[in-house]
Amino acid sequence: SCNTATCVTHRLAGLLSRSGGMVKSNFVPTDVGSEAF
């Protein structure tokens, strides 16, 4: 439904954040998580 590059980029970013958000948070911890390592 969206043809502009910006719209496609945002849609891809949204899909990645939803599908890989949990996995990324485990391997790329936040400030609190990084202190544990």
From Swiss-Prot:
Gene: CALCA
SS bond list: C2-C7
Gene Ontology biological process terms, A to Z: adenylate cyclase-activating G protein-coupled receptor signaling pathway; calcitonin gene-related peptide receptor signaling pathway
Organism: Sus scrofa (Pig)
Compartments in which it is found: Secreted
Cross-referenced PANTHER family: CALCITONIN GENE-RELATED PEPTIDE 2, CALCITONIN-RELATED
Keyword Secreted: yes
Cellular-component GO terms for this entry: extracellular region
Name the UniProt record assigns to this protein: Calcitonin gene-related peptide 1
Entry annotated with the keyword Calcium: no
Pfam families: Calc_CGRP_IAPP
Record InterPro entries: Calcitonin-like, Calcitonin/adrenomedullin, Calcitonin_CS, Calcitonin_gene-rel_peptide, Calcitonin_peptide-like
Function: CGRP1/CALCA is a peptide hormone that induces vasodilation mediated by the CALCRL-RAMP1 receptor complex. Dilates a variety of vessels including the coronary, cerebral and systemic vasculature. Its abundance in the CNS also points toward a neurotransmitter or neuromodulator role. It also elevates platelet cAMP. CGRP1 can also bind and activate CALCR-RAMP1 (AMYR1) receptor complex.
Family under the similarity heading: Belongs to the calcitonin family.
GO molecular function, one term: hormone activity
Keywords: Amidation, Disulfide bond, Hormone, Secreted
Modified residues (Phenylalanine amide): F37
Chief location: secreted
